[in-house]
A protein has these predicted regions:
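Glycan-recognition and catalytic cores of secretory/periplasmic carbohydrate-active enzymes
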Residues: 1-440
Length: 440
């Protein structure tokens, strides 16, 4: 073994060790902080902010004045969120926490981590959209956007796939009939409640909710992945046919430079970091399941665009390459989390992403971890947004680092090294719902 290789392995081992300590500290923070939080949408989730945002979309000039106080607070006084709304539980965050703890179980064999994962799955069973027959999830607040208001507990095809993945991961580790039934129900929801809109002979976009008109790229990518997976799990060819049309919509609407606009409506033509990751993650997962030939070329162009346009001069994720508006922050935890996820999925096919992965993970460990164990949420133009938000970065970063830790454990095992031990700082933590979570 040459010295360069030894040095590389040693450096990676040190990085993995630091990730282990950071994950341990985060779990202890989660136990003391609780499983509800404010959100980056807290400024607009309440009645005052919601009306101001709706006015902005109807009358830009007057509305700009109405939302100005919230935008000012977002940029300079992030803790003011508590004046506009209250902490909430977010299903999409619970799904990420469930997956993160499942990764820790896979890495260490520590059964308490699987118990932690199951705790969050139990919470997901409670938080499903109550007015729908099938299992599905959305936001716990009214979401005002340019097309109107999406009411709380309206299912979102950009949320439900995470719950699907969380239950599938647990089912593969511990097959339970109840989880299989939930997975079947989620697949039926994605296939029937979410609508298709023909865009070409071979492609269809899909609705974001059961009642909108479609056109959002990442929505189609999410649904294509979910139904492709479900077609394999349940042997349902109908799911695969629906998925293939949504997949073709994504492939047919990739720009010549390799990017994807957010939507094809001619209005939301921005290109940002985490939505680009969402699209390419879905493509990578579909390719792993099917070997679809067209995906390889799309990913090649996508990775080239991504690497050349969605990183700043320091080689770190930047929010937009084509922004829809002025942004009040320089970097975002969510972008970094999704970057880590994408690099882990694609580094074998695109080796240049290995250096990106190491750089971003190192940067998170050095600059974004707080003394209490949580992560900073945003790097503002002046200072930091240190308000911990489960839906907006905390859960995603926990999952991505746990995924990194699990993949590192697999690599170590392949090299014949001993299995990773349980994470340090073994303690018992209590969730905000008084349910015991062990960390040993």
């Amino acid at each position: 073994m040459n010295n360069e290789y030894k040095s590389s392995v040693s450096g990676q081992s040190q990085l993995v060790s630091t990730v282990s300590r950071v994950l341990s500290s985060f779990v202890q923070w989660l136990g003391s902080y609780g499983e509800t939080s404010w959100d980056f949408q807290s400024f607009f989730a309440g009645p005052v902010g919601g009306r101001a945002k709706a006015l902005y979309y109807r009358h830009r000039l007057v509305g700009t004045a109405a939302v100005a106080p919230m935008i000012f607070c977002e940029a300079f006084l992030p803790s003011a969120r508590r004046l506009f709304h209250h902490p909430m539980r977010f299903p999409i965050a619970d799904a990420h926490y469930a997956m993160g703890f499942a990764f820790l179980y896979q890495a260490t064999g520590d059964v308490s981590q699987l118990e932690n994962s199951i705790h969050f799955l139990t919470e997901l069973e409670k938080s499903r959209c109550p007015e729908f027959k099938e299992y599905c999830w959305g936001y716990p607040f009214d979401w005002v956007w340019r097309g109107g208001t999406i009411n709380r507990e309206t299912p979102l095809i950009t949320t439900t796939p995470y719950e699907y993945e969380a239950f599938l991961q647990a089912f593969e580790l511990q097959p339970r009939d109840e989880w299989k039934l939930i997975l079947e129900s989620i697949a039926r929801h994605a296939a029937t409640d979410i609508k298709d809109f023909r865009t070409s002979e071979t492609a269809s976009s899909c609705s974001y909710t059961p009642s909108d008109e479609g056109g959002v790229i990442n929505a189609a990518a999410y649904r294509a992945f979910l139904l492709t997976s479900a077609s394999k799990v349940f042997g349902n060819e109908d799911y695969l046919r629906i998925a293939e049309r949504n997949l073709n919509f994504v492939l047919e609407n990739q720009n010549p430079d390799g990017s994807w606009f957010y939507a094809v409506d001619g209005v939301r033509d921005f290109v940002d970091h985490y939505h680009t990751c969402f699209v390419m993650k879905s493509l990578a997962k579909i390719h792993a399941l099917t070997g679809h030939a067209g995906i390889v070329g799309a990913l090649g162009k996508g990775v080239s665009y991504y690497s050349n346009n969605l990183f700043d001069s320091d080689g770190l994720p930047k929010p937009f390459s084509r922004a829809p508006r002025l942004t009040v922050y320089k970097r975002e935890l969510y972008d970094c989390a999704e970057c880590i996820n994408l690099c882990l999925l694609l580094r074998d096919r695109f080796p240049q992403l290995e250096a990106t992965l190491e750089k971003v993970v190192t940067h998170i460990l050095e600059a974004w971890t707080k003394p209490d164990g949580s992560f900073r949420s945003r790097k503002l133009h002046l200072g930091w947004d240190n308000v911990p938000m489960h839906r907006w970065g905390q859960s995603q970063m926990f999952r991505s680092l746990a995924f990194y830790f699990r993949e590192s454990a697999k690599t170590a095992e392949e090299r014949g090294e001993a299995r990773f031990h349980a994470l340090p700082h073994n303690k018992e933590i209590i969730s905000s719902s008084e349910q015991c979570l062990t960390f040993s």
